[in-house]
Amino acid sequence: MSESPSANISDADKSAITPTTGDTSQQDVKPSTEHINLKVVGQDNNEVFFKIKKTTEFSKLMKIYCARQGKSMNSLRFLVDGERIRPDQTPAELDMEDGDQIEAVLEQLGGCTHLCL
């Protein structure tokens, strides 16, 4: 699979997904409220762009992002405005808009400190 700046959600959704080119010269171009463009930013500032339906569960986006980054879904947390996203949520549920950003951060466990007396 070749790396590209944008990722599609699934093979089943390919018929409903159009590439983002920025070309608005066509006469029949109309704004789509069914799809939105989202940007996932990792801790290394790597950006991956997704165009998904507002009703698509984030689990699809998460799986594709993790596969591209070579990480397991259990090792990352996905955040919007500092709040964790659940895999069963959708962009519509979170009132997300075109161009919104999702942060992908490593899960941190532990935090126990030693108490010296």
Curated annotation (Swiss-Prot):
Signal peptide: none annotated. GO terms for molecular function: protein tag activity; ubiquitin-like protein ligase binding. The keyword Transferase does not apply. Residues 17-30 have a biased composition (Polar residues). Residues 1-37 are annotated as: Disordered. GO terms for cellular component: linear element; mitotic spindle pole body; nucleus; septin ring. It comes from the Eukaryota. Its main location: nucleus. Keywords: Isopeptide bond, Nucleus, Ubl conjugation pathway. One of its GO terms (biological process) is telomere maintenance. There is a cross-link at G111 (Glycyl lysine isopeptide (Gly-Lys) (interchain with K-? in acceptor proteins)). Pfam families: Rad60-SLD. The keyword Nucleus applies. Belongs to the ubiquitin family. SUMO subfamily. Required for chromosome segregation where it may be involved in microtubule assembly. Loss of smt3 leads to an increase in telomere length. This is Ubiquitin-like protein pmt3/smt3. It comes from Schizosaccharomyces pombe (strain 972 / ATCC 24843). The lineage of its organism: Eukaryota, Fungi, Dikarya, Ascomycota, Taphrinomycotina.
